[in-house]
């Protein structure tokens, strides 16, 4: 909905950015593409409309860091938001804490942490964990989470670090009601969060083995190449 010019603006800019990025050889981690996106952010900052960002935390952080290092500090229109999902993947060793990310976003774009929304989930576990006002991933009623000991796989109590095990009865197509992730996490009691949601929440603290981490797409690409040999 809204002003038709707004919709056309997004379509035109999106097509232009995709065309430019597709024509670049770039380095493997996509930082050349990020430089192109930074140009577009600067251009969009002159618009009368708010800007909405959707993407991986890692690449969003890299773009903000580039802008900060170059002294590019903008004040985007009210209503601008950042929506994050997908984790840090193979850039996990460069991950920064949330407070550092929020301060950088406010300094570079003028977007406060209340307008930064993050999602957590897994391809094999079709339940979306949306962060609350205090950026905690509360467990929805149609999902469950266990923290398991990394050696024995025994369930752990609140406050203990272990492997994150996600469960839901909402999967019908394949027998994957229980998914063991490679995320290290802590389960916190919901009452400790001031947002009012009493459901327990997940705090992601790391990943098991930072070497050879691949995205889902990269893993699928390798499997296809092997199958075609």
Provide a role label for each language-model segment:
Residues 2-229:
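Active-site glycine/GP-rich loop and adjacent strand/helix microenvironment
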């Amino acid at each position: 909905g809204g002003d038709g010019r707004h919709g056309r603006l997004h379509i035109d800019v999106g097509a232009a950015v995709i065309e430019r990025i597709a024509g670049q050889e770039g380095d493997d981690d996509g930082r050349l593409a990020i430089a192109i996106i930074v140009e577009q952010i600067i251009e969009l900052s002159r618009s009368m409309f708010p800007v909405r960002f959707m993407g991986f935390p890692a690449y969003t952080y890299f773009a903000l860091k580039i802008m900060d290092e170059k002294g590019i500090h903008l004040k985007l229109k009210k209503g601008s938001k950042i929506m994050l999902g997908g984790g840090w993947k193979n850039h996990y060793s460069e991950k920064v804490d949330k407070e550092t990310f929020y301060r950088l976003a406010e300094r570079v774009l003028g977007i406060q942490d209340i307008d930064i929304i993050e999602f957590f989930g897994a391809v094999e576990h079709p339940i979306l964990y949306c962060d609350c006002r205090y950026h905690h991933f509360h467990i929805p009623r149609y999902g469950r989470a266990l923290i398991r000991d990394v050696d024995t796989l025994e369930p752990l109590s609140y406050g203990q670090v272990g492997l994150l095990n996600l469960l839901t009865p909402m999967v019908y197509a394949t027998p994957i009601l229980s998914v063991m992730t490679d995320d290290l996490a802590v389960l916190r009691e919901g009452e400790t969060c001031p947002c009012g949601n009493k459901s327990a929440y997940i705090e992601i603290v790391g990943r098991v083995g930072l070497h050879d981490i691949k995205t889902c797409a990269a893993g699928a690409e390798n499997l296809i190449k092997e199958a075609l040999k």
